[in-house]
Amino acid sequence: KVVILGIIEGITEWLPISSTGHMILVDEFIKMDMTTEFKDFFLVVIQLGAILAVVVLYWGKLWPFYIRQIPKKKKAQLARKNPVARIALTFVEKFCDKDKWILWFKILVACIPTIVIALPFNDFIEEKFNNYVVVAIALIVYGVLFILVENYNKRRKPTCTSLEDLSFATAFKIGIFQVLSVVPGTSRSGSTIIGGILVGTSRTVAAEFTFFLAIPVMFGASLLKLVKFGFTFTPAEILTLVTGVVVAFFVSVIAIKFLMGYIKKHDFKAFGWYRIVLGILVLGYFIGRNFLG
């Protein structure tokens, strides 16, 4: 059961199809032998495996530290001009990948709307709106949006085709779309990818920035859950968490590679139709179950 949840997390966290919608169905058919509190904690913490997959796959684009040797002659000249330069040069030699630092600042800027708007209301929204009706409607609505956005996108060329071209203003706008994902069933990756396409990025840039944006957001969510839950676990709970994280990691690697290969030749319409069908199935199943008692 834990392996199944790890597989679902690894797939649905990165494909724009809503992990919540799938987890509702899994929870209906696969009963987990754990407390409600630990299950909620587990479903958040296994996201660490998904985050680690992004870090591993995109290490070269994300890691801002590297050693660049400055010629000795130039180093001596700078050191003679300024006594402080000798100390500063040590830092410059090791930590000088400006483009990657700028990318991280863009990621942090994109996180601002979530921190200011979504985070304070997250528990309230989860309590009031985490039900099959809201999830099903969100699945269908965002499925329709994907189709409409792709139809609109056919008539124009993207203005941002690389992460280097992504401005701070555009990053912030994508961050605003991420706020929408606080509603269960929307999909964090789905809302930010739609946002990225609407503000003029290519599909590849929208997807990659979505992956990178997930690192601080999902890590923060996992850390917050850990603090709330406490740091005391039974050996069985530790094994459950480790298994879920490891499975989510390997499946996420496959899912990310698949998505990036897929969008080079195709648009997101297939995911839109999938969401619509899934939303109808979720709504139909639970209405039928409640009607039949």
Language-model segments: residues:
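Multi-pass membrane proteins that catalyze or facilitate reactions on polyprenyl-/lipid-phosphate substrates
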Residues: 1-293
